[in-house]
């Protein structure tokens, strides 16, 4: 680490998923970065770690709280909150402890939290997956990565393929196409949901608009928006920021029934703060008035709030 830092490296990504299981080792690594930050506080530095969600010793907490905004990111794998599915895939996870740790990280540190859920696991249906998404939204991580299960060579998930009628794509990345509990159409809808969520939720561009879009039932409401956006555009890629902003305005006004001036003002403020180029049509109609190491998206989440406190 010292050699890489001395040669100019300022972005570090650790892919060891057991980083936080050995507190002494993890603490030493964190202290290494804290020392460099203290020595040159104006010199940008960014460190990314994978974190086991239900294990966060005090020794690590004491170091984590000392990191400034934009310097630390944790990738945290939840995959599923369904205890039966967890047992089936041999995933031992104390969900209550994981929730406590995620809430603590969100409320007491500047760490950027990137948390994942996986759709298509054996025995999990759309309702269960949606409940898991809602549970995660309530914990307010900066990003929720919605992924589709992939078949990896030699992975034990294969032993459940027959029992749950799991059908996978024949080409990489070998994503699941359907299971006995999640239809092919539902898998496709979740895949579109994931793409649109990345553009709207994970992008950090719409902190004022997102809470009104999600309301009291985040998964159901965003899935409805996702289905509507697909019917409107027929696209999941090459959607410019102004296209998304205009779609959000149309949804809020035409579907949700929100006052146009109110919806447009929030979306326009979000859009302007995000630094996106271009001007959505509703803004043109007049309906609404330096160096860093952290990636742009993380900076938006630090300076804004993806999921404001309720």
Per-range role (PLM):
Residues 1-122:
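Conserved SAM/AdoMet-binding glycine-rich loop
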Residues 5, 37, 41, 64, ...:
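Generic secondary-structure transition motif, activating predominantly at the C-termini of alpha-helices
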Residues 20-24, 78, 83-89, 119-127, ...:
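Flexible glycine/acidic-rich beta-alpha junction loops that bind and position SAM and/or redox cofactors
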Residues 30-32, 132, 161-165:
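Short, hinge-like loop/turn segments at secondary-structure boundaries
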Residues 59-64, 122-140:
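Catalytic cores of alpha/beta
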Residues 98-101, 132, 190:
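Hydrophobic side chains in well-ordered alpha-helices
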Residues 192-310:
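Radical SAM enzyme core and accessory elements
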């Amino acid at each position: 680490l010292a050699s890489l830092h001395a040669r100019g490296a300022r972005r570090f990504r650790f892919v060891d998923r057991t980083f936080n299981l050995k507190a002494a080792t993890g603490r030493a690594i964190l202290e290494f970065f804290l020392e460099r930050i203290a020595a040159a506080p104006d010199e940008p530095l960014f460190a990314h770690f994978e974190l086991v969600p239900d294990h966060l010793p005090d020794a690590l907490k004491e170091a984590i709280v000392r990191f400034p905004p934009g310097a630390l990111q944790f990738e945290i794998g939840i995959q599923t909150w369904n205890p039966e599915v967890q047992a089936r895939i041999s995933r031992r996870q104390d969900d209550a402890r994981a929730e406590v740790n995620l809430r603590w990280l969100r409320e007491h540190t500047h760490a950027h939290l990137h948390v994942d859920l996986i759709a298509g696991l054996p025995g999990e249906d759309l309702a269960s997956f949606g409940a898991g998404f809602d549970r995660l939204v309530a914990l307010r991580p900066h990003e929720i990565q919605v992924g589709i299960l992939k078949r990896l060579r030699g992975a034990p998930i294969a032993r459940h393929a027959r029992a749950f009628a799991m059908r996978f794509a024949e080409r990489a990345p070998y994503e699941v196409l359907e299971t006995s509990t999640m239809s092919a159409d539902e898998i496709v809808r979740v895949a579109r949901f994931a793409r649109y969520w990345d553009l709207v939720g994970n992008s950090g561009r719409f902190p004022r608009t997102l809470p009104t879009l999600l309301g009291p039932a985040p998964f159901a409401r965003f899935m409805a928006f996702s289905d509507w956006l697909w019917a409107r555009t027929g696209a999941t890629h090459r959607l410019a920021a102004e296209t998304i902003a205009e779609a959000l305005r149309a949804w809020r006004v035409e579907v949700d029934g929100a006052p146009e001036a109110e919806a447009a003002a929030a979306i326009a403020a979000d859009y302007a703060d995000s630094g996106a180029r271009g001007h959505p049509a509703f803004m043109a109609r007049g309906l609404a008035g330096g160096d860093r190491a952290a990636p742009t998206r993380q900076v938006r989440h630090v300076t804004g709030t993806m999921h404001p406190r309720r």
